[in-house]
Structure formats: C-alpha cells, structure tokens
Amino acid sequence: SLVGSEMCIRDSLNAVDLILFVVPTKAIRNVAKQVNDYLSRSGERPVLVHASKGIEIGSHLRISQMLEEEINPNYYRGLATLSGPSHAEEVSREMLTMVTAASQSLSLAQEVQGIFMNQYLRVYTNTDLLGVELGGALKNVIAIASGIIEGLGYGDNSRAALITRGLAEISRLGIDMGADPLTFSGLSGLGDLIVTATSSHSRNYQAGVYLGQGFCLEDVQIKINMAIEGLSTCQAAYELSLKRQVEMPITKALYQLLYQEAEVETLVKLLMQREGKSEARVDHFI
C-alpha cells in the first residue's frame, strides 16, 4: 500500500549513514522536501551527498544551498558533493575514474572519500565546496558551446581554444565569488570540462552538436530526451555574470543563441572580433 511504502521509505532513510542525491537540478528542491518529510531527529544523523551539477535560475543557488534551504539542519550531519570526470556509462562498467569529494568540513570530505573509494574509483578531497560546485555546473555550458563548434564543422584548434577560454571564464566567475583558483585546474574543473566538452557520452556536448548542425532547441531536446543541464545553467550563469559584472563572452553568446534567437555564425564572428586582450595575469585569468 501507499502508506506501507511511505513507512518503508521513512524507515530506510532513518537507518542510513549517507543519502546520495543524483537528480537533475530542477528536481532537487522537490526531492529534498520529500526527504525532509521522511527524516527525523532520532538516531544517527546521515551525511547528505549530491552528485548533481547545476545552478538554480533566479536564485542562483548551488545544489548544496538548495539542500540547506529545504532540509532541516537538525536532520543531517553535513553536506558534501562528488564531482569530476565521471560518465555513468564508464563508472557502471568499473572503468578507472577519479573524482573529488568536497565539503566545507575536511573530516566530512574524508569520510565520503572513504565510503566511495575502491579499486576503480579514486576519490580526492577538497574543502572548496563553492569552487567544486561551480566548476561542475558551468562546464556544461562550455560543453554545449564545444558541441556547437563540432556541429559547425570547425577543427580541433577551434575546440581547444573554446575549452581553454571557457575555463578562463569559469575561473573568473568562481574567483569573483570567492572560490580557490586552484580548484578549477583540478578534477571538478578542468577534468570535468575536458570529458564533458569532448565526449559523445555527454548530453550537453551532443546537444551542442545538434545546435551547430542547425536543429532548433525544441528538436534538440526531443533528440536527447534526457536532462540537458547546461541549458538552464547557461541562463543562471548569464544572470550571475550580469549581477556580478564578470565578463563571460562564451556564456553570453550561448545565452543569445538559446534564448534571444541570435544566429550562431554571427555569434562566432563577434567572439573572434572582440578587442585584443592579454591572455592572463599571475593572479587569475582575464
């Protein structure tokens, strides 16, 4: 019965050491509210871990912040995320994979590390939860742009340049928000960006390929038929860039393509014709 099922879920959630959230960003709040209803203060409190990658439109909150809003802090011991280059297709086949367990608490990150690390999954720790979550979310935006480059028929030079400059604008926003610059050269930054922006396993990259080939957004979503996190993250990231006055030209161009009906070839020309700049300063990408 429904009542019996709910009691089973409640008993299960209150008998575990860790609850893992692996749902699309748009579903996080609803799932978290249900979990909150089932949890209680009695017994050992679990650790909440998420492997979702996105930023909420409007609020601009990261996944951990949404979980904090929806779940009573008396019901859990702490929050962490697992992030990095980890396509499910390969993890499920026990192919060698490395990810980062991030939490503001080092001891909690180490606890999660110990739970998930095994002979085919190596887990590192990081206390820069902000940077790890931003890297995981924003790389989906750059992955769509990388797919567009492929769909347009440009070569390896173009894609390498786009990924590199994409990392620069991810880093710019992250540093402005208080993240550790080194986080973006790690597994949850550069590592996740490389695999998501180059692999046919990536829904975001494949969506970009279709867009570059001339398919409209509605048709692309039908073809992929699964969540494409980069679409909503692009809007949230663009809003954040305006709010914080951080220059993110690739994100802006993709936003104009997706939501303002700009022509992709025109956007490519505008990106290439931007004023000349120095590539980097010692303290951060520019």
Residue spans of the language-model regions?
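NAD(P)-dependent Rossmann-like dehydrogenase/reductase catalytic/cofactor-binding core
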Residues: 146-150, 175-185, 191-286
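Short loop/edge segments at beta-strand edges and connector loops
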Residues: 6, 81-83, 125-127
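Electropositive phosphate-/nucleotide-binding environments in soluble metabolic enzymes
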Residues: 6, 22-25, 29, 57, ...
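Alpha-helix C-terminal capping/helix-to-coil transition sites in glycosyltransferase folds
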Residues: 4, 14-15, 190
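Short, small-residue-biased leader/transition segments that mark boundaries at the very start
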Residues: 2-9
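Active-site His/Glu-centered metal-binding helix of metallohydrolases
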Residues: 8, 142, 190, 194
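Internal alpha-helical scaffold of NAD(P)-dependent oxidoreductase catalytic cores
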Residues: 38, 70-78, 96-183
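Rossmann-like NAD(P)(H) cofactor-binding subdomain of soluble oxidoreductases
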Residues: 13-14, 18-94, 112
